[in-house]
Amino acid sequence: DLWNGYPEVTNAPYGVAKKAAWQMLDAYKLQYAMKSSYVLPVNLYGPWDNFNLQSSHVIPALIRKCIEAMDRGDNFLEVWGTGSASREFLFVEDCADGILTACEKMDDPTPINLGTNMEITIRDLVHLIAKLTGFASEDTIEQKIRWDSTKPDGQPRRCLDVSRAKELM
């Protein structure tokens, strides 16, 4: 939990930076009466995403892997982990709308989580993307996805509590 101690190890640098930004905004409010809002979006996806397999996030990486597997004529797709981890995603344009709303309605740097409050397991996400890209069908999905359980799942669960956003925005 970012606000109640040191962040989870794989997210520590990012988490500490978020905590520092919040503290800075709080200090500016106290010292200069500066108005601000502090929005923390969940995992984003959308147009102009990063599809570089070395640095992309899960949705664009899976899309690219499926497309490249089809281009090569591969019979299966290898995916890290077991698929049991869950994530929450937000379309980038919805995030932009949320940021604008926060700027219009808030004047306090109280952290606001911006998300959908809906989780999807990586397994279900892989199945969805494989079907939408045409890599697999409902009938072939189980045979076409191979899970490499020797690779990490990452943090077991990431889903934000968006109740404060609903209340204040």
Regions found by a protein language model. Give the residues of each.
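Alpha-helical segments that scaffold the active site and NAD(P)H-binding pocket
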Residues: 25-31, 63-67, 104
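C-terminal substrate-binding subdomain of Rossmann-fold SDR/epimerase-dehydratase oxidoreductases
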Residues: 68-169
